[in-house]
Amino acid sequence: MFNPANQTHFSLSLDGLRHDLQVLEFSGHEGISRPYRFELELVSERAGLDLEALMHRPAFLAFTPQGQGVHGLVYGAAQGDAGKRLTRYRLTLVPHLAYLAQRNNQRIFQHLTVPQIVALILEEHGILADAYRFQLGTRYPEREYCVQYDESDLHFVQRLCAEEGIHFHFRHSAEAHLLVFGDDQTVFPRLGRPTAYVHDSGLVADEPVIKRFSLRLASRTTRTTRRDYDFEKPRLLLEAGNRPAADAPAEPDLEDYDYPGRFVDRQRGKLLSQRALERHRADRRLGEGVSDQPLLVSGHFLEIAEHPRAEWNDLWLLSEVFHEGKQPQVLEENVTSDTSASTDDFQQGYRNRFLATPWEVFFRPPLEHPKPRVLGSQTAVVTGPPGEEIHCDRYGRVRVQFHWDREGQGDDKSSCWLRVASGWAGNGYGGIVIPRVGMEVLVDFLEGDPDQPLVSGCVYHAAHPVPYELPANQTRSVFKSLSSPGGDGYNELRIEDRKGQEQIFVHAQRDWDENIEHDQKIRVGHERHDTVEANSYSEFKAEEHHTVHGERKVELKADDHLTVGDSQHVKLGRAYLARAGREIHLKAGQKMVIEADSELTVKAGGSFIRLDASGIAISGPLARINAGGAPGSGSGIAIKMPLTPGAADADVAGRPLQPANAGLHASDPKQNGEYRFDIRLQDIPGDEGFPLIHTPWRIVQGKEHNLVLEGESDEKGRLVLDDTQQRQLSNACERAPGDVWLVYPGQRIGIRPHREREGWDATRHALGALDFHDTLGGQRAPTPLEHQRGKLDSCCEGDLYSHLLAKD
């Protein structure tokens, strides 16, 4: 057909190697988004070729004397039968990409797009920038976390490309082959000239032709729907779909619905659902043909001409090509086997079989490389930045180092953020315990997806033993924490269930705060022992009742101060016995009555006065009545008032859960933020006031003046509040808006928080320059500079600049 029958059509060249190998026959299969593979049968007059020297060598198989053919690397070599003069050899020719199938890996990629991941892997295999090309029409998002898990590099690359709808094909020359990635039809080149269709009549045509061509139609999915869930936008319905154009032929409604769709915004979901539909329908119309045209290469457009069905005379995208060639004329003698062992009448020349789709139908690689699934759970170690003992984000997520991850550095970049499962999680309530750096945790994977890890628990190991030795303490249930940073302290709740030794043990390393909104009832079946190392403060807003059924023994090592606002009533069943080492001084503002039913005695210095039913007896060396002298005096009272107890640490209640309605798009409820207070004590309000330094102050709440905070101002008159105190004051203002008061000498001022916008001071000066006080409903301030921030904020409901323009 191309050359006389006794001339060879096919030839093999090996880079950097002189040889006498001749192509006896070959077969090959190539397709879009898959490495090609050609099996070559060769003969040589040399019976001892060095097979190792052939391996991995670039080679070019020419189909025609003009140089059309396939370039690749020698992937396999074998020596076959030997005759008197010729020895058979077999070579396998593949692209460089095929070598990726021989390297399996488990690794993590973070914040990279699919093209970036693919390029990284290619260059690790020596496929450099001049050997591959990306011709993409779409910008692909970064994958925050992408795992290659127990799969070959080739499987991983093909899987990622198929998930995104990216295809690849090869372009060949005698010196190299080029790997081209694309995502639309424009990336596919067109073959040089049309190829005529000539029905296979058994005759040999003058030019390469298409001998057979058929078209089949198949039922395929007609619409796709994808849905996903984003925990950062839990009330947002993430769903996207795609269907054929309205003018497409009517077909049954066949939907492909999938969850999770692996997207976090609708635009991305729309693209993925569109690519999925294009993938389903890529081969709905599939052409199949047979030809002897050696120019056919997958990933190229073939133009068919002279077909009796006119609409088929068009461009067709070659998706797969099966090549076959034989040239028995290279044999100059018989060897053990010959080339006639064929099941058909093809004995010599070149032929191919191909699959093709219409040019306007987008090609998308099928999902033939499923994502590996993680079977069961794994363990990992919690990681963080150097020096950090606890590392988490606003959701309590942590990072981990997987045992299989060879590239991770065990730091705050070793994985994505992993959510931590809790036994209870509500809207501002529930339970949370953050796994700490160094802890070994149990990791599950949502639907077995290695890209979606989730911490489900913690486990002990030899280097991190349990709090109490086991099994000696197997009856103990313990929750024990560790002070951070640095350790050297702990909080603990321990429950001992050993028979006869049952116990609940609580240890607080520093403070213990309790808030009980209603009653507290405590019953102690035996003894109770309280030891307070420093002061004890109690305040009862109503009555206090004590009943002691036995004796009461109280010892005070220093003074006892008792202040009773009204009357004190003391009832003694038998006797009142009091002894003072030096003095007893009783003083009444108006009168004092000492009454005894039978006898009253006053005794001092050997003298006494006794009053009883028989009369009054006065006994002493000398009795003076109205004879001068003066009464003795007492020391007088020097009462000290008690300090009020500090308030227990407070928090805000959670909020009821609101079920999400399917199909609705609602925003997240606004979270209540904490105020940050900046308070200064002054003799008068406003910029003209002088700061009151080192002045005691109290912040109280409600009519009963419940103490919230107290302290002393600093050298600038400011209230120095730490984070805990800021939170306590913020919570008090949220619980009782408008009923929280700052009290200091001569002042009682309501605390009414407002949000201070950035740049407020500059805005305030602008308001003063425009005499903004006139807008306060005619209530002019006593001094022009007096602070009215709360009022000004309420006046300006919109943009301050717009408000100024309106006033001007």
Curated annotation (Swiss-Prot):
One of its GO terms (biological process) is protein secretion by the type VI secretion system. The keyword Secreted applies. The keyword Secreted applies. GO terms for cellular component: extracellular region; type VI protein secretion system complex. Its main location: secreted. Keywords: Secreted. It is found in: Secreted. Pfam families: Gp5_trimer_C (PF22178), Phage_base_V (PF04717), Phage_GPD (PF05954). Disruption phenotype: Deletion leads to a complete loss of PldA secretion. Part of the H2 type VI secretion system (H2-T6SS) specialized secretion system, which delivers several virulence factors in both prokaryotic and eukaryotic cells during infection. Allows the delivery of the phospholipase effector PldA to target cells where it exerts its toxicity. Belongs to the VgrG protein family. This is Type VI secretion system spike protein VgrG4b. It comes from Pseudomonas aeruginosa (strain ATCC 15692 / DSM 22644 / CIP 104116 / JCM 14847 / LMG 12228 / 1C / PRS 101 / PAO1). The lineage of its organism: Bacteria, Pseudomonadati, Pseudomonadota, Gammaproteobacteria, Pseudomonadales.
